[in-house]
């Protein structure tokens, strides 16, 4: 049974329930998880250029009608780059930290700029940076992100949108991806874009998910989940994205979520999830990365790659349940059980 398909993305994200994103965050930074999901404190995320491009491509490809609800078109053609972008983002961060709930700012711009200059990495003096900043597109961009980020919008430029449209066109015409992204509703296929499901359980823990694309094939009697990723390195997706961002957690939860959400289709097979990976610069061809029996087993049980251990969903959920039950976030389950004594072998 499909649940939550009509909620807006904002309403979906407001649902207090773990997801693959929060589970990944717990596994990599439990302090941030504790602040965001237990204490309900606001944690600002720094968007990379690739992640913004990914959301743009996803929206233009699957939900173009929602563009204005997710993005704000900047009046500048090009956003600041390199150290100036770092300076602008640092300005925003320190401005936000100095702003109370009524919108009053407790620090002067000069004080905020001094801290932003330190964070940005600029080697030139602050006066020289401000000479480049004041009256420039960078200042306009700074004012825009201050205005719209509080509304849940992402600032993008016309160049960003043009590039995203090029990527969408590539996905629609590439031999590997076109048969997937161009699928439309028919007697044979049911297509669900940005499918929201909630309330499914894995190892007794309740989750929600928003799946980019789910295709139900009534002829083959299969259910296929797709997730779109936009990265700087399509060919090296496995190491530079899948492992780094622990996307195997997402793949496993999506698989389990799809099985439970479509349980009424008793004679249908839920296939392992696939990642559609496109190049955020639109140079390399998109590739499709498929989960296998081995990778799904690794996703659940954990695995080692090049000497580094990656915890599986089973362990991560067990650790999270322990932390919640004991309200203990400053030590791992294993080290607590060992009375904070760690043996070095």
Predicted regions and their residues:
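Metal-dependent nuclease catalytic cores that hydrolyze phosphodiester bonds in DNA/RNA
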Residues: 1-208
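Single, functionally critical "micro-switch" positions that shape active/binding sites
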Residues: 57, 211, 254
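Hydrophobic/aromatic-lined pockets within catalytic cores
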Residues: 61-66, 215, 230-233, 259-263
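Short catalytic/ligand-binding loop motif for oxyanion handling, primarily in non-cytosolic enzymes
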Residues: 69-70, 234-236, 283-285
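Metal-dependent nuclease catalytic regions and adjoining charged, substrate-binding loops involved
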Residues: 93-96, 100-102, 106, 113, ...
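Short regulatory "switch" loops immediately downstream of catalytic or recognition motifs
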Residues: 169-178, 216-218, 256-263
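Secondary-structure boundary elements
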Residues: 185-187, 215-223, 259-269
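Non-catalytic protein-protein interaction segments used by genome-maintenance enzymes to assemble
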Residues: 189-192, 197-248
